[in-house]
Amino acid sequence: MIVVQEEKNLLKAGVFAELTLADYRELEQAISKKLKAQRKLNLLLDLRKMAGFTLDVVWEDIKFTRSHPHDFARIAVITDDQWIPWLSWLGTAFTDADTQTFTDADAAEAWARGR
C-alpha cells in the first residue's frame, strides 16, 4: 500500500507492507501530475514500513526514472534497511537528482524541502 501527499514543492509518499506494481503506478501518476505544474520536483519517500517489493516494480522504476532524468531536484529516502541506500545509489545512474538516504524523518523532510 502507498499513501501519496502533494504539497507545494514536495511530493511525499509512504509505503506500507509490500510495494506492488499498482502502488508504484499510483506514485507515477502523482509525479506526472505534479510535473505538469512545475519544472522540477522534490520527492520524499518513507520506506520504513515497507516489507518488500515485487520484481516488476524494480523494472518499472528503472523505466520511469530513465524517462525523467532531469525532472527531480531532490529525492530523500527514509529507511532503516541497509539495502535501500544501495538501491538508491544505483538509481542515481538514471537521474541527475540530488539523492540522500535518512533514518530521521524530520531531517529527511527538511532536506527535501531545501532547508
Language model segments and positions:
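Amphipathic, Lys/Arg-enriched alpha-helical "gate/interface" segment within cytosolic domains
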Residues: 1-115
